[in-house]
Each structure stands twice: as structure tokens, then as C-alpha cells.
């Protein structure tokens, strides 16, 4: 708690687990504590959406995250996210849609909700690709991105420009 209260950017985490890290953990690779801009977004979501099972509510122990820090986290996370696209196309595309929604509206929502918001704002070829990513995320489509590299790059570049425009950078 001392790493996030009082609030300061970027926040630091001791340990973070997600299914995407399972293989790394199974091999015994446990990352060191680190400063992570994306944690600002996660903590904001935690305050907004957590369901308390025991102890104090998240809103009682974690301070609000200013929107300026959420926007800063998006800006700082954007290059690394795009660089990690190979083999993680669905997640990257959906995360970019979510970044665009948040940087445009200040709302944080699920990846499929962000895709729903973004799809009508996209050209047909981009919307089709984002729809595939959303369906794969929901388990209604098999992730098959081979042969779509050019289309993926074009969509990623469009989403990147849209995010940067929303952030005024």
C-alpha cells in the first residue's frame, strides 16, 4: 500500500499476476518490483469495479487516480503495447480500442465494450478486423491472424493516431 498511498505517478507494484504471465511463472521467472504506468489504469478500475469479499473497500484504501495520470499512462504504455503485437494481435488491437475510448471519453470499460464503441467510428476494413478481435475475445472466433499483417498494421496505425489525437500529442 505504501507504493500507491499517497498517490504518485508512476505507481509501483511488488507482484502482478495475470494468465498471460503463467508460462513465465511456471518457469520460475518472478519479476522484480517495478514502476508501471499501466497500474494507474488498473487501480482506477479496481476502485470503480471491485467486489469486496473481506476487509475495507478498495475506495477506502486506494486514493482516486487523476484522469491526467490515466492519460499519461496511456501515452507511456502505447509504444510498448504496439511493439508487442506479434503473436498477441487480438489483445493489442482490443487494448488500443480501449485506450482510444478512454483517451476520448475518460471512461474505462472492457475490451469488448471498447470495440463496440470503436467499430462504428472505423472504416469498413478496420471495423471488420476489430469485430474479429472482439469475437475472438468473446470465444466466438478462432484467433487466426496469418495473412492479415498489412491490414493489422494499418488498423494499429489508425488506432495509434486516434489515441494520440485524443491525447493532443
Predicted regions and their residues:
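Extended, basic/helix-rich recognition subdomains
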Residues: 71-133
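Amphipathic, non-membrane alpha-helical segments in soluble helical-bundle scaffolds
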Residues: 36, 67, 86-90, 123, ...
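Conserved NTP/Mg2+-binding pocket subregion across the NTase superfamily
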Residues: 1-86, 168
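Structured mid-to-C-terminal alpha-helical surface segments
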Residues: 107-169
Amino acid at each position: 500500500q505504501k507504493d500507491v498511498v499517497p498517490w504518485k505517478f508512476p505507481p509501483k507494484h511488488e507482484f502482478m499476476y495475470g494468465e498471460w504471465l503463467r508460462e513465465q511463472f511456471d518457469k520460475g521467472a518472478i519479476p522484480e518490483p517495478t514502476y508501471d504506468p499501466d497500474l494507474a489504469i488498473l487501480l482506477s478500475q479496481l476502485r470503480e469495479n471491485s467486489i469486496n469479499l473481506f476487509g475495507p473497500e478498495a475506495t477506502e484504501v486506494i486514493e482516486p487516480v487523476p484522469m491526467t495520470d490515466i492519460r499519461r499512462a496511456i501515452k507511456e504504455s502505447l509504444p510498448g503495447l504496439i511493439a508487442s503485437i506479434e503473436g498477441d494481435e487480438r489483445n493489442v488491437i482490443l487494448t488500443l480500442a480501449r485506450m482510444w475510448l478512454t483517451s476520448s471519453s475518460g471512461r474505462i470499460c472492457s475490451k469488448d465494450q471498447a470495440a463496440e464503441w470503436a467499430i462504428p467510428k472505423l472504416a469498413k476494413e478496420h471495423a471488420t478486423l476489430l469485430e474479429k478481435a472482439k469475437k475472438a475475445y468473446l470465444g466466438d472466433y478462432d484467433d487466426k491472424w496469418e495473412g492479415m499483417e498489412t491490414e493489422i498494421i494499418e488498423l494499429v496505425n489508425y488506432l495509434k493516431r486516434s489515441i494520440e489525437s485524443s491525447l493532443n500529442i
